[in-house]
A protein has these predicted regions:
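Short, conserved, GDST-rich strand-edge loop motifs in beta-rich repeat architectures
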Residues: 1, 25-43, 108-125, 129-131, ...
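Beta-propeller blade signature
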Residues: 1, 42-53, 88-94, 143, ...
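Short, solvent-exposed loop/turn segments at conserved positions within beta-propeller repeat blades
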Residues: 37-43, 81-82, 135-136, 191-196, ...
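Beta-propeller fold detector
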Residues: 2-4, 57-60, 96-109, 151-160, ...
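Non-catalytic accessory segments flanking enzyme active sites
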Residues: 1-20, 25, 33, 164-264
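Repeat-solenoid scaffold signature
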Residues: 83, 112-154, 227
Length: 264
């Protein structure tokens, strides 16, 4: 027996292990195609479909970002830009459940001033077992138990909000979306008042360790293959973004370029 899961004109969203699910998702932008003339990116609707019967159900309208499946393929996490909440979709039951209201803080960019729904602050990553997702608010990381057994937990223990600093994962050649229990993540702490930035190490118990900090904006370019060394730069209004070399914990830094000496 063949069952149509989705029309050929839509985007089917399948996780790894999809053969074990009862429900999957697809997105359909066809209701919004007339808006292509004035929108950079078309919104889309999200449907769930029973893979056994082909029965389809509309579960989200006018989305801007596609759902993301957990690494174990059991749940899809998706941000509803109209309701301004995060939901989870259960691939076994087809149910959609709000997972962010219990946090108590906005999960969307409150100062967003473009003619479109405010986007979410985003997803920081997942635990290796796929049962938890880490979401950003304006300042901190929140650990959400997708099994529903535990309430949301502020991984960073409110440090970011208390000190007015936004804690975000830094981009590099070794950054990850999936974190082991002993993972240590390189994050930036950006002060919204002074614009100063710090580079810290965050572990999965929420402990922060300062690596470097100052009146700069930092960018990590690359860690060495053995993860012992790093190339990065820092800059501010009076210092050009020269390259620096250091150990992977940013100790013993050495300036390796002098590209714009007249700025000093």
């Amino acid at each position: 027996k063949l069952t149509e899961v989705a029309p050929f004109t839509v985007d089917l969203l399948l996780p790894s292990g999809a053969e074990n699910l009862n429900y999957v998702l697809y997105t359909d932008e066809s209701p919004y195609k007339m808006q292509r003339e004035w929108l950079d990116r078309l919104p889309f609707d999200i449907y769930s479909v029973n893979v056994h019967t082909g029965a389809k159900r509309l579960i989200g309208r006018s989305y801007r970002t596609a759902p993301k499946w957990s690494v174990n393929g059991k749940w899809a996490v998706m941000y509803d830009p109209i309701a301004q909440v995060w939901n989870k979709f259960d691939g076994a039951t087809g149910k959609v459940v709000n997972i962010s209201d219990a946090i108590g803080y906005p999960m969307f960019m409150e100062s967003y001033d473009k003619p479109a729904p405010a986007p979410a602050y985003g997803i920081a990553g997942w635990t290796a077992d796929g049962n938890n997702v880490f979401l950003y608010d304006a300042y901190d990381w929140w650990k959400i138990d997708l099994t529903g057994e535990r309430q949301p937990e502020c991984l960073t223990k409110g440090y970011g909000r208390k000190h007015g600093k936004s804690i975000r994962k830094m981009t590099s050649n070794i950054d990850k979306d999936v974190f082991q229990k002993d993972e240590k993540v390189i994050v930036s702490l950006w002060d919204k008042d002074t614009m100063d930035e710090g580079v810290y190490q965050l572990d999965m118990k929420g402990r922060l360790r300062k690596l470097m900090e100052g009146n700069y904006v930092y960018t990590i370019h690359r860690f060495s293959d053995n993860h012992e060394y790093c190339v990065w730069n820092r800059q501010n209004v009076s210092e050009f973004r020269d390259l620096w070399w250091s150990k992977s914990d940013f100790s013993n830094p050495v300036k390796v370029t002098n590209a714009n000496p007249q700025q000093a």
